[in-house]
């Protein structure tokens, strides 16, 4: 269970800041493109990655939440977890270990590897988006 105050902070302050900052950076980037200012375009890349990633990651995070969530998944997802991790319990242990192993800010992820047709656990630093960083399709994100 995550309390309402934490969720309100995450939505109204953290996620909102990523969106607002991304909008500002995108405007500056468009100006740099129009001017042909490659130096400015390159200089804006870290802010695009951080704020764009923060927006992407938190948008995924909100879709993962449910007022009656928790417990084991059902159907194809549970079968894929058992196939790729041995059991739901082993999956939780591995995802927890990877997530708590993130130093500083970051994310623990369950993703789908399209090339291998299997689930994978990964971590990303800061607000680096999973798909843009690893190529995995994000299924579940844990903000650490």
UniProtKB/Swiss-Prot annotation:
3'-nitrotyrosine sites (modified residues): 18
Give an example GO cellular component term for this record: mitochondrial matrix
Give one GO term, molecular function aspect: manganese ion binding
Q: What is its main location?
A: mitochondrion
Spell out the reaction equation it catalyses. Answer: 2 superoxide + 2 H(+) = H2O2 + O2
Which EC class is the enzyme in? oxidoreductase
EC no.? 1.15.1.1
**InterPro entries in alphabetical order:** Fe/Mn_Superoxide_Dismutase, Mn/Fe_SOD, Mn/Fe_SOD_C, Mn/Fe_SOD_N, Mn/Fe_SOD_N_sf, SOD_C_sf
N6-acetyllysine is found on: 28, 35, 74, 82, 90
Share the record's PTM remark: Nitrated under oxidative stress. Nitration coupled with oxidation inhibits the catalytic activity. Deacetylated by SIRT3 upon exposure to ionizing radiations or after long fasting.
The record's annotation in Pfam families points to: Sod_Fe_C, Sod_Fe_N
Q: How and how many cofactors are bound, per the record note?
A: Binds 1 Mn(2+) ion per subunit.
Q: Which UniProt keywords apply?
A: Acetylation, Manganese, Metal-binding, Mitochondrion, Nitration, Oxidoreductase, Ubl conjugation
Positions carrying N6-succinyllysine: 28, 35, 82, 90
Name its co-factor(s): Mn(2+)
**Protein localization:** Mitochondrion matrix
Q: Where does Mn(2+) bind?
A: 10, 58, 143
Q: Which family does it belong to?
A: Belongs to the iron/manganese superoxide dismutase family.
Protein's name in the database:
Superoxide dismutase [Mn], mitochondrial
Query: Gene encoding this polypeptide?
Result: SOD2
């Amino acid at each position: 269970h995550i309390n309402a105050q934490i969720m309100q902070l995450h939505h109204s302050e953290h996620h909102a800041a990523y969106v607002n900052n991304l909008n500002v950076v995108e405007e500056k980037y468009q100006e740099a493109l129009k001017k042909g200012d490659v130096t400015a375009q390159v200089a804006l890349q870290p802010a695009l990655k951080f704020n764009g990633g923060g927006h992407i990651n938190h948008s995924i995070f909100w879709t993962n939440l449910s007022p009656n969530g928790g417990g084991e998944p059902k159907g194809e997802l549970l079968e894929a977890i058992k196939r790729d991790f041995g059991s739901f319990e082993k999956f939780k242990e591995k995802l927890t270990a990877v997530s708590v192993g993130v130093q500083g800010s970051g994310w623990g992820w369950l993703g789908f590897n399209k090339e291998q047709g299997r689930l994978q656990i990964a971590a990303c630093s800061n607000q680096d988006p999973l798909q843009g960083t690893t190529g995995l399709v994000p299924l579940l994100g844990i903000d650490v």
